[in-house]
């Protein structure tokens, strides 16, 4: 089990990025959450099988077709994770 906190920068809001990420995470059997930030980035916590977590982070480098990802910051996370994947409001 692995958990990573990621911040995604670029043209990532208003392009369906959160819904895309949630759908991909659920398809991979991952848990966590995703939300927009007021600073224009998308933030996510992704947890599950390490290979699936890394696969999703690789996919996040491209994102949905309307997105343009400039940068992804990722850090290991050790907080307890609730099963399932949620899409939260902007913070």
Curated annotation (Swiss-Prot):
GO terms for molecular function: acylphosphatase activity. The active site is at residues 18, 36. Keywords: Hydrolase. PROSITE patterns: ACYLPHOSPHATASE_2, ACYLPHOSPHATASE_3. Its EC number is 3.6.1.7. Pfam families: Acylphosphatase (PF00708). Residues 3-89 form the Acylphosphatase-like domain. SUPFAM superfamilies: Acylphosphatase/BLUF domain-like. It catalyses: an acyl phosphate + H2O = a carboxylate + phosphate + H(+). The keyword Hydrolase applies. It comes from the Bacteria. Belongs to the acylphosphatase family. This is Acylphosphatase. It comes from Granulibacter bethesdensis (strain ATCC BAA-1260 / CGDNIH1). The gene is acyP.
């Amino acid at each position: 089990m692995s958990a990573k906190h990621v911040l995604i920068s670029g043209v990532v809001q208003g392009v369906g990025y959160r819904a895309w990420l949630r759908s991909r995470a659920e398809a991979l059997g991952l848990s966590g959450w995703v939300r927009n930030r007021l600073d224009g980035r998308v933030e996510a916590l992704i947890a599950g099988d390490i290979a699936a977590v890394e696969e999703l982070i690789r996919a996040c480098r491209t994102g949905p077709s309307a997105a343009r990802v400039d940068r992804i910051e990722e850090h290991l996370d050790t907080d307890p994770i609730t099963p399932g994947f949620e899409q939260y409001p902007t913070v």
